[in-house]
Amino acid sequence: MKLKDTKSRPKQSSYGKFQTKGIKVVGKWKEVKIDPNMFADGQMDDLVCFEELTDYQLVSPAKNPSSLFSKEAPKRKAQAVSEEEEEEEGESSSPKKKIKLKKSKNVATEGTSTQKEFEVKDPELEAQGDGMVCDDPEAGEMTSENLVQTAPKKKKNKAKKGLEPSQSTAAKVPKKAKTWIPEVHDQKADVSAWKDLFVPRPVLRALSFLGFSAPTPIQVLTLAPAIRDKLDILGAAETGSGKTLAFAIPMIHAVLQWQKRNAAPPPSNTEAPPGETRPEAGAETRSPGKAEAESDALPDDTVIESEALPSDTAAEARAKTGGTVSDQALLFGDDDAGEGPSSLIREKPVPKQNENEEENLDKEQTGNLKQELDDKSATCKTYPKRPLLGLVLTPTRELAVQVKQHIDAVARFTGIKTAILVGGMSTQKQQRMLNRRPEIVVATPGRLWELIKEKHYHLRNLRQLRCLVVDEADRMVEKGHFAELSQLLEMLNDSQYNPKRQTLVFSATLTLVHQAPARILHKKHTKKMDKTAKLDLLMQKIGMRGKPKVIDLTRNEATVETLTETKIHCETDEKDFYLYYFLMQYPGRSLVFANSISCIKRLSGLLKVLDIMPLTLHACMHQKQRLRNLEQFARLEDCVLLATDVAARGLDIPKVQHVIHYQVPRTSEIYVHRSGRTARATNEGLSLMLIGPEDVINFKKIYKTLKKDEDIPLFPVQTKYMDVVKERIRLARQIEKSEYRNFQACLHNSWIEQAAAALEIELEEDMYKGGKADQQEERRRQKQMKVLKKELRHLLSQPLFTESQKTKYPTQSGKPPLLVSAPSKSESALSCLSKQRKKKTKKPKEPQPEQPQPSTSAN
């Protein structure tokens, strides 16, 4: 058999290939003699030859990456060999460090040489780079096939080493969820005021950590009847009064009591039963019986704490991180733990192995993965005593996220697991969260009912539900809203009914009754709705049996005392003027409400043209973007959020200074909840209504329902600045309208062209929106837009609130007087409104003319 000429070997691209893989070829390839008897059976007819390389160098790609990954053409053999010999002579002058190599012998196939596997023991191998040469003479026995196999493994190892810094950082720094809820550090407040309310000891510890030294009125009146007497609660309190903790603490207490009653006894023998694995030492367990066996003399609260919290260290770590990584990843739409570079687990570098060992390792890892999945499924099946114990229903997704965060903060030292089920997020992630069998679930009705219909095993048996909470209940049970909620409540009160279940219902407008529409009042058999009738109807829809405890702390006005209400009467076209004037004159964290999504989109485009970058929040947005905008709005001090009534209920955004009703709400309940986004927790806030001609009817209904004794004051506006404001708004409207029409036309025409191309038909000019695009007309439009934008930029570059100096005589310099900036904007809208009130009260009343008294004459 004729062998291939060995001189043609270096002409192949193997030199550059081996160089990029970390091996520098110094010598020549030599032919390996093969026994001719190996070709007798005819199975090796395709074999050409075997070649071996004995003279080479190990090169680190990190030392000189530019030379290893160079895109230059390969040099000729003679030139390359001469350059390598020169480099070797230059390197031989410097002392070379010998590296001890560990040999790992493998069983070789018959007729082939024994292959050697080397593992570098010197940690300075990567640092030495090109200055290292293998001194072992047996290294030359490595064949070209083995070199090709080991090279990709080295590349994989280097890729792993490159990820190690980020992996170590991700392992040390816990993943932090971005929420609009402010961070609270360990304040260690005095919680003696909570002890008479039967609050569990681990919850008291969390309250001290959060700095809640005293309960609010709604919490004082709710906790004792709910925890001690286990009564159903109908609670109505002002916005920002702490209703979340009023139902979260009784729910946590009910879960802890269930865990105490169903605590498993400790095992008598130390060996694990067959088919089960023994937990490792120091691992966190959820066996409350172990803590109970260790200390039988503890008080009841301490027993509960020990049962729910087997490891204080793990609980404190959970408190610092604010929950597990997977919980936060589920909340905010991030990838699962273990997906992506930020959640990788740092692994030790794997030593080089031959092909057989790599296959065995892959099989072993695959088997371990299957075993882990089987263990997870078995774990879900071996926890029959961890059912769903608490369920919280909320009307909006953002409110559900907030409620879960508050429950986690209070239950951080109890070991209770929570999960959130809302729309707009991955169903698979939420199913994996349910696989952990959380004791408490916070959900919106739609997604919860969807998972119940899919018959998830954690949601199959709701008879063991110990606590049901309906937050913002008046909105949840409104006719025409949340059809899934009525089906869910019907199931809970029929097939899944539990007589021991406790129901807690809360809302800021639970007892507020607004006037029904005229079309309903004119009907014959219409009953007038009052407070008692509304509560009875609510209890009937929710399915509350028995007589619950009603706690009503709302005022007649239904708004908080620290809220300042004001209004501006204007035309519909002038609302943009006053909105822009207010945002420029009184910067801060402002929340603007409108009744429709189209109005929000128009305002967003208009304000962006005016160099105000607002954030938006409405139902048509993606859930990730909604949460991201809320977090950014809470983080920035001077920011504007344009929102529909999605953001009106329950959201606790810190330090919102102004709430502006661009459109008057249709009902008084919506007005109360909108205004409740500011003036929370004894802070002051301002609520401004822009009332147009079409809003007068709704405004009168709200004024009548809230039983206002005094008229809402007018907000002071300095009319001398309105001319400049109107000019800016006029230009901005033209630019925004032109851009919007052009965008809609391009969108429509693009869709038409794609549809025509798919159908292979020709389009006529009248099918295009606005006619077929004319280059000359488009050029003229763009030129006009440039002129308008240039004029608007000139106006925006000048200060808006300025006062000109009026001089009686010509100036000495012969130039017009300079504009003097208006007083600083440190004065807030609240202080400006209070000054106006003081001026009105200080005006002396006009003296009335004295009436002449009738004279009396003596007879």
UniProtKB/Swiss-Prot annotation:
Residue span of motif DEAD box: 471-474
Pfam family, one: Helicase_C
The family this protein is said to belong to: Belongs to the DEAD box helicase family. DDX24/MAK5 subfamily.
Cross-link (Glycyl lysine isopeptide (Lys-Gly) (interchain with G-Cter in SUMO2)): K370, K624, K808, K825
Keyword match Flavoprotein: no
Keyword presence, Nucleotide-binding: yes
N6-acetyllysine PTM sites in chain numbering: K17, K71
Keyword annotations: Acetylation, ATP-binding, Cytoplasm, Helicase, Hydrolase, Isopeptide bond, Nucleotide-binding, Nucleus, Phosphoprotein, RNA-binding, Ubl conjugation
Enzyme class: hydrolase
Protein name stated in the entry: ATP-dependent RNA helicase DDX24
Binding locations of ATP: A237, E238, T239, G240, S241, G242, K243, T244
Modified residues (Phosphoserine): S60, S82, S94, S287, S295
Localization terms from the record: Cytoplasm; Nucleus
Region spans: Disordered: 61-175, 262-374, 799-859
One term of GO molecular function: RNA binding
Short sequence motif named Q motif, residue ranges: 192-220
SMART domains for this protein: DEXDc (SM00487), HELICc (SM00490)
Sequence ranges of Basic residues compositional bias: 95-105
Compositional bias ranges of the Polar residues kind: 106-115, 799-814, 823-834
PTMs per UniProt: Ubiquitinated by MDM2 without targeting DDX24 for proteasomal degradation. Instead, polyubiquitylated DDX24 promotes interaction with NIP7, a component of pre-rRNP processing complex, and associates with pre-rRNA molecules and pre-ribosomal particles.
Entry-annotated residues carrying Phosphothreonine: T302
